[in-house]
Amino acid sequence: MTRTDLSKPKVASLNEWLEARKQFLIREKEFTRLRDQLCKQRRELPWVKVEKNYVFDGPGGKIPMAELFEGRSQLVVYHFMFAPDWNEGCPSCSFWADNFNVIGIHLNHRDVTMIAISRAPWEKLEAFKRRMGWNFKWFSSGNNDFNYDYHVSFTPEVLKSQVEYNYGKWERGDELAHDY
């Protein structure tokens, strides 16, 4: 292990370590309770109705956003960075995507559909996905404003100003909403 600050932790007896660990555990539990409160507050944030009928490009051609849910009540969108003029996807996004095949199965059993969306053309996404050995659902938003409307892609003008930054069906028929 390399330490960048050049300091070394104190070496102690097992009893000293145990006492320090117990004190630290008290702080960890406080943090857990605080994190639980913050998570509850995040879940209680209001939703924003999705006003546009976004249509994405995928394996079957054009698909409306509401159909991306595949009959489930929630949709998790991973905004995979892959611009139209790139030859391959973002390396960091690719790292995370290596786990999407199994995560998708887990989420499906919990009434959640997980997909990736990128601005690159669908054919380019599909070729990269095949090369990487992935089978998760991936759609192109290259023919709509989705990425721009939800602040994950930016025009040069927006980049010069304030840049900001989730979707679910609720018991209101086919209306969609954006969440945290």
Over which residues does each language-model region extend?
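Short, thiol/selenol-centered motifs that function as redox-active sites or metal-ligating centers
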Residues: 73-125
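Amphipathic alpha-helical coiled-coil segments
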Residues: 17-34, 38
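Coiled-coil termination/hinge junctions
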Residues: 40-59
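A common structural microfeature
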Residues: 14, 21, 28, 51-53, ...
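Thiol/selenol-based redox catalytic cores and closely related redox-interacting motifs
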Residues: 131, 135-180
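A short beta-strand-turn-helix
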Residues: 55-85
